[in-house]
């Protein structure tokens, strides 16, 4: 059995713009670990949210779809990101890092943020583009 414990940062940046809100994603493979007696692949992702619109917006909710080639799709929903509900003025950027464990060495994530325009209180969804979670061995 091969154990991968070398942290690998993927330099491919995925970007998407919805209503002037630019989402950029970088992923990192952090190695393998055992949890509850099972082998898991540890991935982290860094997301930058850039407000290129002329409006102030607040990120209120997140919706994730996590695809693992050995398991069913997992849906994660909740308030804000990493315990925060950031407000972004025009030209502001908010960045954070989070992660997930997969049962396999290949997966993907996608989703959306729910934002509220702070001027007119309209809600809208900002797409998070699909990004791959891949171990380095699969890239060879």
Can you say where each PLM-predicted feature lies in the sequence?
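Asparagine-centered strand-capping/turn motif at beta-strand->loop junctions
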Residues: 49-53
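Intrinsically disordered, low-complexity Pro/Gly/Ser/Thr-rich segments with frequent PxxP/GP/PP motifs
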Residues: 74-106
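Short, solvent-exposed beta-strand/turn "edge" segments of beta-rich domains on protein surfaces
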Residues: 31-41, 54-55, 87-89, 102-104
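Terminal connector regions
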Residues: 101-140
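Short, solvent-exposed loop/turn segments enriched in Ser/Thr/Gly
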Residues: 41-46, 110
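Low-complexity, acidic Ser/Thr/Pro/Gly-rich terminal tails and inter-domain linkers that flank the onset
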Residues: 12-40
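Short acidic, flexible loop segments centered on an aromatic residue
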Residues: 55-74
